[in-house]
Amino acid sequence: MIRDGNEEMSTIPGFSQIQFEGFCRFIDQGLMEELYKFPKIEDTDQEIEFQLFVETYQLAEPLIKERDAVYESLTYSSELYVPAGLIWKTSRNMQEQTIFIGNIPLMNSLGTSIVNGIYRIVINQILQSPGIYYRSELDHNGTSVYTGTIISDWGGRSELEIDRKARIWARVSRKQKISILVLSSAMGSNLREILDNVCYPEIFLSFPNDKEKKKIGSKENAILEFYQQFACVGGDPVFSESLCKELQKKFFQQRCELGRIGRRNMNRRLNLDIPQNNTFLLPRDILAAADRLIGIKFGMGTLDDMNHLKNKRIRSVADLLQDQFGLALVRLENAVRGTICGAIRHKLIPTPQNLVTSTPLTTTYESFFGLHPLSQVLDRTNPLTQIVHGRKSSYLGPGGLTGRTASFRIRDIHPSHYGRICPIDTSEGINVGLIGSLAIHARIGHWGSLESPFYEISERSKKVRMLYLSPSKDEYYMVAAGNSLSLNKGIQEEQVVPARYRQEFLTIAWEQVHLRSIFPFQYFSIGASLIPFIEHNDANRALMSSNMQRQAVPLSRSEKCIVGTGLERQAALDSGVSAIAEHEGKIIYTDIDKIILSGNGDTLRIPLVMYQRSNKNTCMHQKPQVQRGKCIKKGQILADGAATVGGELALGKNVLVAYMPWEGYNSEDAVLISECLVYRDIYTSFHIRKYEIQTHVTSQGPERITNEIPHLEAHLLRNLDKNGIVMLGSWVETGDILVGKLTPQTSKESSYAPEDRLLRAILGIQVSTSKETCLKLPIGGRGRVIDVRWIQKKGGSNYNPETIRVYISQKREIKVGDKVAGRHGNKGIISKILPRQDMPYLQNGTPVDMVFNPLGVPSRMNVGQIFECSLGLAGGLLDRHYRIAPFDERYEQEASRKLVFSELYEASKQTANPWVFEPEYPGKSRIFDGRTGDPFEQPVIIGKSYIMKLIHQVDDKIHGRSSGHYALVTQQPLRGRAKQGGQRVGEMEVWALEGFGVAHILQEMLTYKSDHIRARQEVLGTTIIGGTIPNPEDTPESFRLLVRELRSLALELNHFLVSEKNFQINRKAA
């Protein structure tokens, strides 16, 4: 793509554009391509023919809105209608109907789909591009073995190999290989055609002996030999049509279909001119590949870099949806074929509508969105998370790599990633380097390659052109790096700049540069582009920061950062959490849940999101930002969403921090905070939890929702209304009943009272009882009920039960154990909340909000936090906000430090506070101990940093158990917080207790508190009475389990117990 115009006018593309454009490409092109492949279907007697007329297919508008689909747990989809005809060949009559094929899930403008009420997203996959690749490996003798690997469109591989005697083999399986002549002959070429189409016929003539010549004497012999080697069949197989079909299905269709992209790559690599619509591997391809392999063997050619992005292709959402649509049509074809045969067999008159069912298409897409590894639940923790999730690229998935087998070379950064895949933003752990994030300006090209924009430097034309180049093209240009550009063009032309050429980094004169970067953020992802002073941070810490920003919780009172990078507004806008005016007009009414706009004679009602739950239990809420009577323009922000302020991303708070040790409470990345952060609700967030229950029709009758629950205390039922559902606005505690439900059941005969048995015997009355199956609030769920939804499916049946959902809001203040982090990888856990009077305070009396450990900076090499901290202090005093692009050293040396010191100096002058900038130790200040009032010995770095509260909160993780459930086999406490489990005392824990000599505590942990059934029952009673706990006199259950397992191995283990009494008696007798 080439754009003319001024370089200052280039804009950042929409962050959700890649997903939405891919879906539009599927609707416009992929849908039609697959429908055209649908064949004409005939019955066995060839009397009836069924076909689709795909030129006039229709996609109906969805019957429900997005909000209703989420509310009722439905799929937001469109119905596909295609005209179909049924032709009777004997009478030449045709019956035509428009039939319903199925539902296709739609995608909104943010790149997400709603399936069964859940937001889902399909991420892009990076695969090896189909074609041929030459590489060299060393065998066990240390000799180079050259191979050419042919990769099909489906991922199947075949290899051409040349040995030390210059003989060429085709490896059709891991163990079997055949001569290249046999393969070419089996594909339809004779020896004369082979020799006429190769550059080295003497090499091809040198190795066939009499036996080989017999094998390639005819096509049938070559096919038999090829089948024998491929299928590993012994004996002498006989040539037949079924043998050819089996070979065609198992080998040629899986390993020889190159596809559109593979044909293009094959033509370019081997200098062929085969038409693009010929997507299968031809004998001509095999011979040209063998010629190139011989040339590479003798030094005339280059090997391929398998990790270069020019040898990769992006499998986007369009390709995945098209593959699933083709699979659904194959299933539909089989169903139609079977229905036609059944109708003819039973002498029925079929119609097009009766032949087609919507089940194949609907179930295929539901299983794809629900089970496919590349279809994931959209992470909606905060607005940044939503847009970053859709820009992920993964090497994993079907046809790709696995986290355990991928090598370090694949995970590593490659020079071709420049401007296409972010070198910083990747996942941590086993998938590091395999799941990346697309760079800001990257886009997916027509051939599935990642393209990046550059400015072309031309002296002939004064206009600046912007080119989008694929990885195979930009390696032929000298590309200047974006961080080497100067504002003064006169100086720029004289300087020597770093550039990239053929995957190498060089230093060249400016006159030799062909292209240059268009933007300093061009090679970073969105997450990395939001880190100020990123050039002063270690890459590992920048990676942690870009990951932790996606874990930030939206706060109740958001605040935009003092020091930013300028992309905060674009990120908030593209996330879709803010309400944007689509038309200009006048605000005639505004409320907490809606805005009414009047313009062009129409009145438009804009509903706002009210306390909506995300799938990470965070609160999504919109706040109106316009007043009644104001005139607005198109594109203006009407309401801020969660974690946005004034249309800018606001994930954290600007707090006053100090880098100093404080009584050891901030060692090992712990953080000391002031109680002001609690009392002033600075880090207070709202979380919404969903609890649901369903009513079924059992064999004993339907379940009932009621507030009359026997055998339960009235205190637990105090919040239920007359229908048995908790009332809105109620405050509920752990154990309270949210929905009262009774399940009918028939009691056993032995459990009846005597009078009940008499009634049954005399009157034949069946006495039924009900079991209480209420929805109870679990541990840690206390809060306020903000919404109750009773969803009744149409035509309710056993398969469509009624669902009741209760939404409870929790207000969480920051507390000890919560995790906080900055934007430079500086993370920590709250260790202590100090009273404000005990916190260190500045020279003007302001107490510090947070105290960080200074030892966390030099070893981690994330010095960017110090620049941000000092510049934030200046911005807070001057009431300024800074937006700084990275790599500002391209303007002058030490530009970041000079900017920070100049702003601190100006703040010191304007506020008449000389302590803000002291020349002896710039950036530091003398501060005082809040407990004693004495100054600390050393000056301390103080400033305002942007600190976020992360989703890892202590309320979700802390757990304690007094009693609970036990495992059936081992009789030991269950494992995990969700099951109210206990903490396991394992082998190493036992060693630790033994090391301290605490024998009685160890015995309690292994007996009373674990699996000694009788002893743990006696402990409770003796504890209440106040007596001594008796020693156990029998074995624990785990020992008995060991004995049983040994018996299952035919080993009898006899054991007996020796008590302390026996020892004491024997001791007295002695």
UniProtKB/Swiss-Prot annotation:
It comes from Buxus microphylla (Littleleaf boxwood). It comes from the Eukaryota. It is found in: Plastid, Chloroplast. Belongs to the RNA polymerase beta chain family. The gene is rpoB. DNA-dependent RNA polymerase catalyzes the transcription of DNA into RNA using the four ribonucleoside triphosphates as substrates. One of its GO terms (molecular function) is DNA-directed RNA polymerase activity. One of its GO terms (biological process) is DNA-templated transcription. Keywords: Chloroplast, DNA-directed RNA polymerase, Nucleotidyltransferase, Plastid, Transcription, Transferase. This is DNA-directed RNA polymerase subunit beta. Its EC number is 2.7.7.6. SUPFAM superfamilies: beta and beta-prime subunits of DNA dependent RNA-polymerase. It catalyses: RNA(n) + a ribonucleoside 5'-triphosphate = RNA(n+1) + diphosphate. In plastids the minimal PEP RNA polymerase catalytic core is composed of four subunits: alpha, beta, beta', and beta''. When a (nuclear-encoded) sigma factor is associated with the core the holoenzyme is formed, which can initiate transcription. GO terms for cellular component: chloroplast; DNA-directed RNA polymerase complex; mitochondrion.
